[in-house]
Amino acid sequence: FSDKFLMKNYISNGGLLGGHPDRNIKLGIDYCSGSLGNGLSVGCGVSLSYLKNKINKKVLVILGDGECNEGMIWESALFAGHHKLSNLFVFVDYNRQQGFGTTDEILGLDSLKQKFQSFKWNVYEVNGHNFKELINIKKKLKKNNKKPSVIIANTIKGKGVPFYENTFESHYKILSKSEFEKIKHL
């Protein structure tokens, strides 16, 4: 993912990395979930298939907190807990912002942790900017007790970039050359 061509053409016509990923097996993107909420449903299906066919693989689904406003997320979460999809791992970027407002303004999630716990998930909350916490969570995930697991990573959108930190402008925007030059040293 560090290839300069990929990043140079991010969210552009002909680029391989869009705002919502397109399926690209070479890049490790097995499914495109441009319609928010679909990714967890697909992840549940793949997870169930692996378990039924005794295939020892894990399924990772990455969600944004705004995506957790979608009803399909909660139907899938309930399904995963009920069917004990222990090979399913979800990572939620919980930055409390969406493309057009804060999560609380648009549709508050209240306690994301309690919601997943009530659906019979293992729930881990971490500081999404602390790499030690993120690495240590991997050890806990190995001790999975026959439930799906969710990591809720509390983050700040655009953290460390003064003109983007905690702003809506950073949601769909590509850095200009001058903006990139300003942050290279950070």
Predicted feature descriptions by range:
Residues D22, M72-W74, F100-D104, V161-N166:
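Short acidic, glycine/serine/threonine-rich loops at helix termini
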Residues F131-L186:
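Glycine/aspartate-rich loop-and-adjacent alpha/beta segment that forms the canonical ThDP
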Residues E70-N95, V150-I152:
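A short alpha/beta connector and helix-capping loop motif
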